[in-house]
Amino acid sequence: MLIPRKVAHRKQHHPGRTGAAKGGTRVTFGEYGIQALESAYVTNRQIESARIAMTRHIRRGGKVWINIYPDRPLTKKPAETRMGSGKGSPEWWVANVKPGRVLFELSGVAEPVAREAMRRAIHKLPMKCRFVVREGGA
């Protein structure tokens, strides 16, 4: 699981989920990628589940890059607790994903295999995504 080793503050304000991604919108490391079409919080478990789905399909060949990291804690108060008495304890670690962000990249396999592997990974994610191919050039 992806979890930060050390954080300055245990609890954070909720980040904004509106607007488009400012960076990381192109496939840079691999040949193929998964691009988000909606904004969402992606938990560390969802990232790991998508990674496993991809790697199981491509078997031995290919390399996978994960371009997002769950560095924000989401808190939750216990069930049947009265309001007040502070913020709840950190429950999950999430990555704040905005539209246009490339989440995963893949190389070293044929396009049909990559397309199917990415399709399986997209089913594990909480938002609409699309398969993208690296643009020609440098």
Swiss-Prot record:
Basic residues composition bias: which ranges?
Answer: 1-16
> Organism classification, top ranks?
Bacteria, Bacillati, Actinomycetota, Actinomycetes, Frankiales
Please give the name of this protein: Large ribosomal subunit protein uL16
Pfam families, A to Z: Ribosomal_L16 (PF00252)
Q: Name one GO cellular component term.
A: cytosolic large ribosomal subunit
Q: Which organism is it from?
A: Frankia alni (strain DSM 45986 / CECT 9034 / ACN14a)
GO MF annotation terms? rRNA binding; structural constituent of ribosome; tRNA binding
Function noted in UniProt = Binds 23S rRNA and is also seen to make contacts with the A and possibly P site tRNAs.
Q: How does it assemble?
A: Part of the 50S ribosomal subunit.
